[in-house]
């Protein structure tokens, strides 16, 4: 279930209902802090997970659940974006027929709104995966060369920096592939919607090469050209006809 990017204000009513009726709640510390005001620890069992222990906790809760009991696994943002590796494992453990996926407002959506760069005119990528990202890197290059905006989630890998693909790594990769980063406009959002700690950087891609950002960040490569309904022939012809009449 998605619980939004960080602020409880972005939590949906259906998500709140699911949390309240659950006996078991499993999630990462930052995500659980988003919903802590809704959790009742006197009647709900809260399980904090990490990359290392999540498998054993999912299995343990599944084995202890009784018929009619509910378990909620909240994700920051939207459960359908950048969380597929965990969701697919939960489907394996609990079974497709026993799992309901509840969408949430993602940091990608909020970043799109903050920057006024529409999703339907952008290439959206998540590098926040465990597997190979070379194909996604090619998509990134192609999108930039096609003059599309790109909204992306970078990849932090604290235990193995060689697998990092954070903002500075992305810029170095773009330069190696012949992209002029000095003219490329970018945004970086950290801790989106989180009270008092949200940050926004706006500048050129070349500025990012020596900068470090939090893993909870979104990067936008801004090549947006605004286009309204008046830019299309149908509306121009309609306006002309109205004037003539």
Regions from the PLM with identified roles:
Residues 1-102, 110, 207, 216-220, ...:
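Class I S-adenosyl-L-methionine
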Residues 2-6, 126, 153-156, 188:
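Glycine-rich anion-binding loop/nest that anchors nucleotide
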Residues 7, 13, 77, 81-148, ...:
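Class I SAM-dependent methyltransferase SAM-binding "motif I" and its flanking Rossmann-like core
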Residues 24, 72-73, 100, 123, ...:
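A structural signal for isolated positions on well-ordered beta-strands in alpha/beta enzyme cores
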Residues 32-34, 106-110, 130-133, 158-160, ...:
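Short gly/pro/ser/thr-enriched loop/turn and capping motifs at secondary-structure boundaries
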Residues 42-45, 116-120, 204-205:
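Short, hinge-like loop/turn segments at secondary-structure boundaries
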Residues 49-51, 102-104, 127, 189-191:
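Conserved beta-strand termini and adjacent loop/short-helix elements that scaffold enzyme active sites
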Residues 69-71, 144-245:
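A contiguous loop/helix-start segment that scaffolds small-molecule binding in enzyme catalytic cores
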């Amino acid at each position: 279930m998605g619980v939004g990017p960080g602020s409880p204000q972005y939590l949906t009513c259906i998500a709140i209902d699911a949390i309240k009726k659950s006996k078991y709640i499993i999630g990462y510390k930052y995500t659980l802090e988003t919903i802590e005001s809704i959790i009742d620890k006197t009647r709900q069992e809260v399980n904090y997970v990490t990359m290392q222990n999540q498998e054993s906790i999912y299995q343990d809760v599944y084995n202890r659940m009784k018929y009619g009991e509910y378990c909620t696994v909240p994700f920051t943002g939207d459960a359908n974006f950048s969380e597929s590796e965990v969701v697919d494992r939960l489907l394996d453990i609990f079974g497709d027929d026993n799992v309901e996926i509840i969408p949430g407002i993602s940091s990608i959506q909020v970043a799109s709104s903050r920057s006024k760069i529409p999703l339907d005119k952008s290439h959206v990528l998540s590098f926040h995966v465990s597997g190979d990202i070379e194909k996604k890197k090619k998509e990134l290059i192609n999108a930039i060369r096609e003059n599309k905006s790109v909204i992306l989630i970078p990849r932090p890998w604290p235990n193995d920096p060689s697998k990092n693909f954070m903002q500075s790594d992305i810029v170095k990769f773009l330069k190696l592939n012949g992209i002029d980063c000095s003219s490329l406009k970018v945004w970086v959002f950290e801790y989106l919607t989180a009270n008092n700690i949200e940050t926004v950087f706006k500048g050129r891609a070349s500025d990012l090469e020596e900068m470090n950002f939090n893993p909870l960040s979104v990067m936008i490569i801004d090549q947006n050209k605004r286009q309204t309904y008046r830019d299309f022939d149908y509306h121009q012809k309609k306006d002309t006809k109205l004037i003539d009449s």
